[in-house]
């Protein structure tokens, strides 16, 4: 199980283990490196926390499963990749399944009523779609949730100190003095923060790497070449805090070219907020930026829900100017299209129009199935089905 620090990996996995070892002290790490096979000893399921600090543990697990295969025998957790990836001699395919854990969605933090089910939409259960005015949820609530994030300790904290908890997470994110991983120790924290800030300024856009590099140079009055940027980006990706969204290519039979540039996203929007020093009040004063930050939070929740159904979230954009914020594509071929808006009749109408254009183009010029549903996902407002068949629902009613 991989994911960013502070998202609850160890706490969750402790619920499923019958014995465990934590590689969180220098003594434990040294012993595991000297005798990685011994780390496997213990009642199964055996939890090995922060396995990447003794990477040969992975090889020992794989070898053990080659000769003594059982389902659910080991649980490995990690908040970064190994310092030296060459020490992992096998991908684990066919032996070890990888699970990505993110901070909590609103459904998981019990801040979504869950009356709108993506599973039901995929199954065509239109009669289960609610009509709900949803009057007790405001933009101010969304701004707060966005800045707080889905970090379990922040979620549990009283509202008046939850933002401070998230701030403390950001302040400690790039403290590597005691880190045994040279890849992180050799990075300058201030440069990592610069890149994350530039990334945050381009949140929910398809900004090219060259654009982000130029932003770093201009905003901080310093030089940065593409090689240095790529090196620092690898470190940020290894910390699981960035999560770009790749493009959907439905193989359209026309001269239309599908754009392949990924959309820039974070594993949790609160990281972007803290990087830029953005508060709930700031968001309320800049609705254009608020919309981009909200799109990022919505993508976080859609990813969590869609992956639990056996699928992934992609984006669509072609050279004809047609763009869709999120395409929810299941492994069985079913898909649904989602436009993400803060709310308001004009925005909802624009989102519905985009969705219907995409549906028409796919049905006319692609071998893809027709979409299971079209959904305008809003920050606030009610849930209902429009006369044209497009569903409208706020994020605080959504669940898998």
Which positions does each model-derived feature cover?
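Active-site ExK catalytic segment of metal-dependent nucleases
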Residues: 24, 336-346
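Conserved nucleotide-sensing/catalytic segment adjacent to the nucleotide-binding pocket
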Residues: 33-75
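Domain-level recognition of nuclease-like catalytic cores that cleave nucleotide substrates
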Residues: 125, 377-400
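Accessory nucleic acid-recognition modules appended to NTPase machines
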Residues: 155, 159-334
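Conserved lysine of the Walker
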Residues: 9
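Interdomain motor-coupling "hinge/lid" segment immediately C-terminal to the ATP-binding subdomain
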Residues: 86-205
């Amino acid at each position: 199980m991989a994911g960013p620090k502070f998202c609850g990996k160890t706490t969750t996995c402790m619920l499923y283990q019958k014995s465990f070892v934590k590689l969180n002290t220098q003594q434990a790490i040294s012993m595991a490196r000297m005798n990685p096979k011994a780390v496997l000893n213990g009642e199964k399921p055996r939890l090995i926390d922060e396995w990447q600090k003794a990477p040969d543990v992975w090889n020992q697990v794989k070898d053990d499963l080659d000769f003594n295969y059982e389902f659910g025998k080991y649980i490995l957790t990690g908040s970064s990749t190994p310092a030296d990836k060459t020490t992992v001699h096998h991908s684990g395919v066919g032996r070890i399944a990888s699970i990505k854990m993110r901070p909590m969605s609103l459904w998981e933090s019990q801040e979504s009523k869950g009356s709108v089910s993506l599973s039901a939409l995929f199954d065509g259960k239109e009669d289960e779609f609610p009509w709900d005015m949803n009057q007790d949820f405001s933009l101010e609530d969304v701004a707060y949730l966005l800045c707080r994030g889905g970090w379990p300790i922040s979620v549990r904290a009283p509202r008046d100190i939850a933002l401070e908890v998230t701030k403390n997470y950001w302040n400690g994110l790039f403290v590597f003095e005691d880190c045994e991983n040279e890849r992180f120790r050799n990075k300058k924290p201030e440069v990592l923060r610069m890149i994350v800030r530039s990334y945050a300024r381009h949140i929910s856009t398809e900004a090219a790497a060259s654009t982000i590099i130029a932003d770093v140079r201009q905003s901080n009055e310093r030089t940065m070449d593409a090689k240095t940027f790529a090196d620092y980006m690898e470190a940020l990706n290894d910390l699981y805090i960035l999560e770009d969204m790749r493009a959907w290519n439905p193989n359209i039979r026309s001269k239309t070219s599908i754009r392949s540039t990924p959309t820039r996203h974070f594993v949790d929007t609160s990281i972007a907020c803290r990087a830029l020093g953005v508060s709930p009040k700031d968001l309320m004063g800049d609705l254009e930026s608020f919309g981009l930050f909200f799109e990022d939070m919505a993508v976080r929740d859609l990813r969590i829900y869609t992956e639990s159904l056996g699928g992934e979230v992609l984006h669509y954009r072609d050279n004809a100017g047609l763009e869709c914020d999120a395409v929810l594509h299941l492994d069985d071929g079913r898909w649904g299209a989602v436009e993400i808006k803060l709310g308001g009749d004009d925005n909802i109408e624009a989102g519905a129009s985009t969705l219907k254009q995409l549906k028409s183009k796919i049905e006319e010029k692609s071998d893809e199935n027709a979409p299971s549903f079209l959904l305008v996902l809003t920050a606030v407002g009610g849930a209902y089905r429009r006369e044209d068949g497009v569903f409208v629902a706020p994020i605080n009613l959504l669940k898998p």
